[in-house]
Amino acid sequence: MKTYTAKPETVQRDWFVVDAAGQTLGRLATEIARRLRGKHKPEYTPHVDTGDYIVVINAEQVRVTGAKTTDKMYYHHSGFPGGIKSINFEKLIAKAPERVIETAVKGMLPKNPLGRDMYRKLKVYKGANHPHTAQQPQELKI
């Protein structure tokens, strides 16, 4: 029996909608990253993007445990000397709640062109509305 290798043109991709309300950030992000990679499918192939599209709603209602609301820091750099910027979880969730989930999931995906393609299939929105109703996403319980 030959080992099956998925072909990019034959991969069946589904759309799923995930409600982040009351979910723990890390546990939610690991399951989303797993589904974006396609590891939940029997035809998973490491060098082919076999993952599904994931739409996350209610991003502002995601939660973290312990004192991470004030202690968890997000860093970025302007590119200039001394240009390191930081913001904590509490301020970032108020300013741009989508970035919290996007950052957590992006860190769990491969750091290569294939990982960037997987990341593009993630759509995160604050609030319960999203513009992907035409794709008829199925609800995914995590």
From Swiss-Prot:
Coiled coil: none annotated. InterPro entries: Ribosomal_uL13, Ribosomal_uL13_bac-type, Ribosomal_uL13_CS, Ribosomal_uL13_sf. Pfam families: Ribosomal_L13 (PF00572). One of its GO terms (cellular component) is cytosolic large ribosomal subunit. One of its GO terms (molecular function) is structural constituent of ribosome. One of its GO terms (biological process) is translation. PROSITE patterns: RIBOSOMAL_L13 (PS00783). It comes from the Bacteria. Keywords: Ribonucleoprotein, Ribosomal protein. CDD domains: Ribosomal_L13 (cd00392). Belongs to the universal ribosomal protein uL13 family. Part of the 50S ribosomal subunit. This protein is one of the early assembly proteins of the 50S ribosomal subunit, although it is not seen to bind rRNA by itself. It is important during the early stages of 50S assembly. PANTHER family: LARGE RIBOSOMAL SUBUNIT PROTEIN UL13M (PTHR11545:SF2), RIBOSOMAL PROTEIN L13 (PTHR11545). This is Large ribosomal subunit protein uL13. It comes from Pseudomonas paraeruginosa (strain DSM 24068 / PA7) (Pseudomonas aeruginosa (strain PA7)). The gene is rplM.
